[in-house]
């Protein structure tokens, strides 16, 4: 859920800088707790860092198109059933680097963690296995 009415205007303002290829922003949980989203510490080994490229996420379409289709899928050829966001956020950040990425500090999204169908509530073991597999994949080269 968008946190405020001017979220898209704020994001558009960020993209006025032609050097911005992708963003991630800050969120709050539905009960008011602050979320964990923040900019990565460095653009080196982002797959080994605590995952912080969270809601709300945006990117240039051409950047998305650089992701290999097979990296968006599991070993059975199916799109990742859980934790699939890592399969596209890691490659796009690796290709962008810190200089083409912007973290939006303003809270722009409310995350409904009360949903009983959240992946981490339904099958945390599968989430952890998938996270490990995606983190173990080859990194992308910076563009």
Regions found by a protein language model. Name each.
Residues 1-142:
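Nucleotide-sugar donor-binding/catalytic module of glycosyltransferases
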């Amino acid at each position: 859920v968008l946190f405020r009415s001017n979220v898209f205007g704020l994001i558009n303002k960020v993209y006025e800088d032609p050097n911005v290829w992708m963003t991630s922003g800050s969120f709050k949980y539905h009960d008011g707790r602050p979320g964990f989203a923040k900019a990565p510490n460095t653009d080196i080994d982002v797959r080994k860092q605590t995952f912080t490229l969270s809601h709300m996420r945006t990117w240039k379409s051409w950047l998305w198109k650089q992701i290999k289709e097979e990296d968006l899928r599991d070993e059975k050829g199916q799109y990742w059933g859980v934790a699939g966001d890592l399969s596209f956020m890691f490659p796009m950040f690796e290709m962008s680097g810190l200089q083409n990425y912007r973290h939006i500090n303003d809270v722009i999204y409310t995350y409904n963690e009360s949903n009983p169908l959240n992946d981490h509530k339904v099958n945390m073991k599968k989430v952890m296995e998938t996270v490990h597999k995606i983190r173990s994949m080859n990194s992308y080269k910076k563009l």
